[in-house]
Amino acid sequence: MFWFDAVLLGVLEGLTEFLPVSSTGHLILLGAWLGHQSEAAKTLDIVIQLGAVLAVVVYFRERLSTTVRGMVRRDPDSLRLALALAFAFLPAAVVGLLFHKAIKAHLFGPGPVAAALIVGGFLMIGVESLRRRRPDQGAPRVEDVTFQRALAIGFAQCFSLWPGASRSMTTIVGGQLSGLSTAAAAEFSFLLAIPTLGAATVFDLVKNGRALLDAPGGIVALVVGLAVSFAVALLVIAVFLRYLKRYGLAPFGWYRIALGALVLWLWIASRSAPAEAGAASASPAPRGDVAAAVDGLARTGDHPSRP
């Protein structure tokens, strides 16, 4: 594991974790392009999201501090927000634990990732079209997230277990459809990332953390990846919230459709290659050969997972 790989992964994680474009899908493709096959490398793909979680904590530190103090004082708004986050967290946590192996076996491949990117892109464009026809008049505050809305967002987040769907996309769209304003849906999505991504990272560390720590340069790669993902994610959060208010979700929808179509085309092209290339493609893909990387994903089915 080279530290430069950790920098690339950290930049990509920070850029895509909170954008509705699927960080998992992007990391799967970058990891294959870099030739990551070891358990340590794949664990790093998951663990560096702690940097993004820390960025949320820092960016929303005033909100979090106010909520914690309010819970101590039994402030109704603070208690409602904390319980809403817990309600929204539970569905994906339960589904992830129950179906983790099945999801990894059947959905972690270029075909499912491409399909999720394309379907999610059309969904975002459709929701954005509805929103533009009806001005954003949803509940304006995250404190307005009722338990019913929280459960709706939580069940929507379950679809993010499908690599390529995007946790950010499913929770923001779920919030909008449940009656929240775009701003409130986005803020709730960011806050929900703290328990969701934190739990996913702890789960993977417990299972595979030793492989990363024992790997040559593993600790250095972890520190570098965390630092880079934190710095990039902190910038992305601020820019994305302003961008979302002005332009909405549609541009990200078109990006998802274009990327999904490209991945699907590369995957189909690699699978239709001459049969004699099969033996070579079963080995780790060389750096820079994107088509071979996509084909390697299809053949091995061995990818980083997020429970």
From Swiss-Prot:
**Which family, according to the similarity comment?**
Belongs to the UppP family.
Give the note. Bacitracin is thought to be involved in the inhibition of peptidoglycan synthesis by sequestering undecaprenyl diphosphate, thereby reducing the pool of lipid carrier available.
Q: List the disulfide bonds.
A: none
What GO molecular function annotation could you give as one example from this UniProt entry?
undecaprenyl-diphosphatase activity
Q: Does the keyword Thylakoid apply?
A: no
Q: What is this protein called?
A: Undecaprenyl-diphosphatase
For this protein, the record's NCBIfam families field holds: PRK00281.1-2, PRK00281.1-4, undec_PP_bacA
What PANTHER family would the database entry show?
UNDECAPRENYL-DIPHOSPHATASE
Q: Where in the cell is it found?
A: Cell inner membrane
Q: What class of enzyme is it?
A: hydrolase
| Catalytic activity as recorded in UniProt | di-trans,octa-cis-undecaprenyl diphosphate + H2O = di-trans,octa-cis-undecaprenyl phosphate + phosphate + H(+)
UniProt cross-references to InterPro entries, sorted A to Z: UppP
Q: Which UniProt keywords apply?
A: Antibiotic resistance, Cell inner membrane, Cell membrane, Cell shape, Cell wall biogenesis/degradation, Hydrolase, Membrane, Peptidoglycan synthesis, Transmembrane, Transmembrane helix
Entry's Gene Ontology BP terms: cell wall organization; peptidoglycan biosynthetic process; regulation of cell shape; response to antibiotic
GO CC annotations on file? plasma membrane
Q: What does this protein do?
A: Catalyzes the dephosphorylation of undecaprenyl diphosphate (UPP). Confers resistance to bacitracin.
- Membrane topology per record: Multi-pass membrane protein
